[in-house]
């Protein structure tokens, strides 16, 4: 008898909260869309400034990483999350290569290389975690 009461109470609670979850969805979707637009504009602005020589490549990587991470985090499918993470890995690889080149010319140090290596490894770790079970390994 207690089990029936518990299940009934759970069912009622679920019915009470479900409409509020659906009501949040359009608001959340609007926020997600607006944030994607803002982050995209930031990337475009930083790239423009980089082309003009008024900012460095770190600013470009940071802006792109923010956009890609956001898109990964709000993606609704595992495949889309993985696609965004693959782009993050590619971005981190380019960043590491550029920092290594600067270190070779003496304009960067070994700590910067280590930090960029860590960022790449963290991105690859996340990519591995997002892989479907059958493709891990």
Describe the role of every protein-language-model region:
Residues 1-10:
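Bacterial N-terminal signal peptides that target proteins for export
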Residues 9-18:
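Bacterial N-terminal signal peptides
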Residues 21-25, 29:
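Boundary at the C-terminal end of the N-terminal hydrophobic targeting segment
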Residues 28-68, 81-120, 124-126:
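Charged, solvent-exposed structural "stalk/scaffold" segments
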Residues 135-137:
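Short, solvent-exposed mixed-charge patches
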